[in-house]
Amino acid sequence: MISKSRRSFIRLAAGTVGATVATSMLPSSIQAALAIPAHRRHGNLKDVEHVVILMQENRSFDHYFGTLKGVRGFGDRMAIPLPDGQRVWHQKGSKGEILPYHFDTSTTSAQRVDGTPHTWPDAQQAWNEGRMDKWLPAKTERSLGYYKEQDIAFQFAMANAFTICDAYHCSFQGGTNPNRLFLWTGTNDPLGQHGGPVTTNDHDSNGPVEQGYTWTTYPERLQAAGITWRVYQDMADNFSDNPLIGFRQYRAAAPDSPLIVNGLSTWKLDALKRDVLANSLPQVSWIVAPAKYSEHPGPSSPIWGAEYTSWVLDALTANPEVWSKTALLVMFDENDGFFDHVAPPAAPSLNKDGTLRGKTTADATLEWHTKGDIRYRNQPYGLGPRVPMYVISPWSKGGWVNSQVFDHTSVIRFLEQRFGVMEPNISPWRRAVCGDLTSAFNFANPNNEPFPELPDTSQADAIVASQIKLPKPKPPAVAAMPKQEMGIRPARALPYELGVHARYRSGGDALSLTFANTGKAGAVFQVFDLLDSENPPKRYTVGARKRLHDSFQGDASGDYHLEVHGPNGFLRVFRGNLRRDLAERKAPLPEVRIDYEPLFGNLRVQLINRGRHPVKLTVKDNVYRQGERRTVNVPPGQRREVRYSLRSSGNWYDFSVSAQGADSFLRRFSGRMEDGRSGFSDPGMGLGTLTF
């Protein structure tokens, strides 16, 4: 477990505005409740008897946690390339280049910063089919603003106290209502059969019975299965964030119908606390915050959102017995327009002739926009950018990070796993790629992880009032790359076992790649061609225990330079020249393949020479072994093996292979070997992008 000083957990946001505000612990009742052991009757998911879901508004992961240690933030060495060859941090607009910059709440009004464009058209523009190079034209310069721990102390403390998910994506490239529909129903009706496809905030308030959506929502499925549920909200002030109001069956329901009583009635946080104290908390609950506390930029602020979250915790922990059986999931519906550097996994884009730019083993029919606005016809709906996700429960304490790919449908899938109520609206592609959140919990041995102190939020109004008078934040005159705090945090085991293997295609006119997935979860490989600035990356969705093959041409001179990006820092780099490497088979023909040996903690590197002449290959460590080099002579037609123990690096690896006599040849392999056990985050996080 990663320790942190007591003082850092009680640092208050007020300190950043020069005000002297007394700090204190959260109420002692909360501390006492959080310290009690988790309910452990079965030692598995059945111990969770209540799931509470709080979806807040409009913050991206980098915007909040790019500087948090031990997560995939600003120190990511595997940041994707832009079409101009620079890394994704270097966004360009009409005023030139801007890097992510600090929303300093001590000198600016950043607590109440204005929002940015966040609709389907501008989200598609910023993403740009995966190029990720249009954030400034689409989202304004505010999109690159981010906070530090001193600005959002409560949010950092939550991440350090419980579990933060750093690969949780919003479901849809766009705004509030479509994303909330994925959380409550698993879909946006992509085929337009029941009032969709939903790409805007239509029907987010009450309307005529004959208007609205008609597909089945997940609360209805819970009701039919006898699972208790409720939406806690103030119907007079829920910021239009309850999407159930847009469904005809809810609009037409009788006043005493469960759809009205539990879905469209006022149940504020005091009602939540009463239900907790009375041991009548439903099995599944959704919470919708008022506008002021929604965390939405403009009408709300991070510290108001923190205050509301602390009230939710206060209510849930008022009865320690109930809290010992409760999981609270807190996420954000979308990123607003705030920048996040990770290219979202998505179904393949389509070429102009309608063919896929990539491949998929999972049915992605429901992932493309085929109805409605022709401007975005055939564009993938998602996934969208990463958003923060906290898993708060007695089974997820200890400052963990979980890096499995999730989206809003993952919340429904968690409920499926716990209560057995299936949601057929979730697409096959999302089921293949997005997990069910169970990997974020420790049910077997949950009670050995202490709970650190949390900041007080009682002075939120005073802090916001003092900051609102300060100047608005703006980019600095001289751009500089932000620094992520160095350090590690405990990391949950993931279900990935991925590989990409290269070989020259027979005939020598292309490089053939095999995308192999021998793990338990699907993954998206994104292939960036650094010599092709015109086309978007190709994407390959490979389901569990499946593989795909494809070939890649070189440029006019035979050069090729490919980067393959996957989940949790998975990276493969392939560089060389097809003509020089293959001309009359006189040049060396090296190939490199790696295999995992998790039982022994080893990585096996196979160095292969398919040419007619000997080749000398040098294997160089890039991060974890102080630049160690091993040079191996490989005779023609043979192979040699090199093994690396990964135990000292927590199974993380990053090395490159070059070939004497083939100057352009380079292979790079980076990632983590999963062995079914929890470990720790990448010790090399924070070093920045490596160049070769």
Curated annotation (Swiss-Prot):
CDD domains: PLC
Pfam families named in the record: Phosphoesterase, PLipase_C_C
Record-linked InterPro entries: Alkaline_phosphatase_core_sf, PC-PLC, Phosphoesterase, PLipase_C_C, TAT_signal
MF terms (GO), sorted A to Z: lipase activity; phosphatidylcholine phospholipase C activity
Catalytic activity: a 1,2-diacyl-sn-glycero-3-phosphocholine + H2O = phosphocholine + a 1,2-diacyl-sn-glycerol + H(+)
Keywords: Hydrolase, Signal
Parts of the chain that traverse the membrane: none
Free-text description of this protein's post-translational modifications in UniProt: Predicted to be exported by the Tat system. The position of the signal peptide cleavage has not been experimentally proven.
Signal peptide: 1-35
EC number: 3.1.4.3
A Gene Ontology biological process term: protein secretion by the type II secretion system
Domain of life (superkingdom): Bacteria
Family the UniProt entry places it in: Belongs to the bacterial phospholipase C family.
Purpose: Hydrolyzes phosphatidylserine as well as phosphatidylcholine.
Protein name as annotated: Non-hemolytic phospholipase C
Organism per entry: Pseudomonas aeruginosa (strain ATCC 15692 / DSM 22644 / CIP 104116 / JCM 14847 / LMG 12228 / 1C / PRS 101 / PAO1)
Gene name of the record: plcN
